[in-house]
Amino acid sequence: MSINKNLLFCGGFFFVVLYSLFVMRPFRSAVAAQIGTSDLTFFLLLVVLVMLIANGIYSLLVSKIKESKIVLFIYGFFVTNLFLYALFNYVFPNSYWVGASFYVWYNVFNFFVVSVFWARAVNCFNTDDAKKYFGVVSACGSAGAWVGSQSVYLFLSDSP
């Protein structure tokens, strides 16, 4: 198996995607604990409703914008959202609604960043190359998930 630029691009891309998910996952879990089990069902229903709306918007965007631009647009949208959540968390520390909306947002983010990645990755390879390389790409994603979770552990632990 030879290493080509599509494999490097997709492997690196998926590493970063899953890294970001696993860095944010403990914060989502903390928010879920803050929400409590009595309200969690409501917020899961809210996730489904937001996903229905977001998928409709995404379908409309995909029909109007080139594939290379849609990836930049979607990821740019989510990066902007992250900065806004950092600002909201700074301005409104310990806000129930900032945390609860982050919980919904994270679940939508989780779905979209992985789906958009695979939609892009499928177009990087022909059928034969996909059979050869998708396992490696998945392994790169798994490595990103592990490094992301370990980064949080190291950052939050008291040991040097």
Positions of PLM-derived features:
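Helix-loop boundary and gating motifs at the non-cytosolic
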Residues: 2-50
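Hydrophobic alpha-helical segments of secondary membrane carriers
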Residues: 13, 74, 136-140
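Hydrophobic core of transmembrane alpha-helices in multi-pass small-molecule transporters
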Residues: 15, 94-113
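Transmembrane alpha-helix termini and helix-breaking/packing motifs in multi-pass membrane transporters
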Residues: 35, 52-65, 86-91, 119, ...
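Glycine-rich segments within core transmembrane alpha-helices of 12-TM secondary carriers
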Residues: 41-53, 131-152
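C-terminal ends and interior cores of transmembrane alpha-helices
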Residues: 76-95
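Intracellular juxtamembrane helix-capping segments at the cytosolic ends
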Residues: 109-126
